[in-house]
């Protein structure tokens, strides 16, 4: 199914007859988006817009995911759902545009802004890369001047489905609601794993191989309701699930 193709989307809905659709697809490579602008736009803007229009025609609720990258980072307290967007990079602009387009196309859409994923089932997220490096005795570089809100993926899934079932609409911020720098997050996770926190190299974001500009503060908080557990509980569950996986 190509969600950027109207015929493909309409055919899939007719075939599977879902009661709702959750769109977890999209272009996620923030740095590469600076040069893959057309692909980023197609996957992050055109696709969700076409899908939203198809869901509106079929009367289906829709969940789409957005990002903390829609903000400019000029605040020093967490962004809520009503703060003005001001993306700094191509990826962030694609997410801000997608929000506007899907909300214009469909009145029964839930837009979930989230941030800084980690989960037990992949080895590419921040925490997994940290643990791998430290476990091999290698230093791990993490920004000490960029503040985010880490999000445990299983909690995000549970909260998204709860809101969908409850018929919630509009923009929601879903994270584990703790604002901290990448380097502090790395030290906390390393300590939980009983690895050497001294191998965490706190550095400035300018010293990292990032090509796309990023907000230095993009922590999120919901002014609608708190529906996700805190970060301590998220890390507890992460390490339990990781041991099982």
What residue ranges belong to the model's regions?
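NAD(P)H-binding glycine-rich loop region in Rossmannoid oxidoreductase-like domains
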Residues: 3-43
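Conserved catalytic-core motifs of eukaryotic protein kinase domains, centered on the activation segment
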Residues: 31-38, 73-77, 123
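Catalytic helix-loop patch of NAD(P)-dependent Rossmann-fold dehydrogenases
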Residues: 42-50, 57, 70-112, 118
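NAD(P)-dependent short-chain dehydrogenase/reductase
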Residues: 100-148, 155
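Non-catalytic, hydrophobic alpha-helical segments
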Residues: 156, 174, 185, 225, ...
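Mid/C-terminal beta-alpha module of Rossmann-like enzyme folds, strongest
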Residues: 159, 166-211, 239
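C-terminal amphipathic/interface module of NAD(P)-dependent oxidoreductases
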Residues: 198, 213-245
């Amino acid at each position: 199914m190509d969600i950027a193709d109207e015929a493909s989307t309409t055919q899939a809905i007719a075939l599977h007859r879902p009661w709702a659709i959750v769109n977890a697809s999209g272009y996620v490579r923030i740095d590469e988006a600076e040069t893959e602008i057309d692909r980023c736009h197609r996957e992050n803007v055109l696709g969700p817009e076409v899908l939203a229009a198809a869901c509106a025609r079929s009367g289906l609720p829709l969940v789409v995911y957005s990002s903390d990258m829609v903000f400019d980072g000029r605040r020093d307290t967490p962004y809520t759902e009503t703060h003005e967007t001001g993306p700094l990079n191509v990826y962030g602009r694609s997410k801000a545009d997608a929000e506007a387009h899907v909300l214009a196309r469909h009145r029964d859409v839930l837009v979930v802004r989230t941030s800084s994923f980690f989960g037990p089932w992949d080895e590419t997220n921040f925490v997994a890369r940290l643990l791998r490096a430290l476990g091999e005795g290698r230093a791990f570089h993490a920004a000490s001047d960029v503040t985010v809100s880490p999000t445990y993926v299983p909690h995000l899934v549970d909260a998204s489905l709860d809101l969908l079932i409850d018929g919630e609409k509009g923009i929601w911020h879903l994270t584990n609601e703790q604002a901290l720098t990448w380097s502090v997050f790395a030290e906390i996770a390393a300590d939980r794993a009983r690895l050497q926190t001294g191998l965490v190299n706190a550095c400035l974001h300018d010293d990292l191989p990032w090509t796309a500009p990023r907000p230095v503060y993009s922590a999120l908080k919901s002014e609608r309701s708190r529906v996700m557990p805190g970060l301590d509980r998220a890390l507890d569950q992460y390490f339990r699930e990781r041991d099982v996986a």
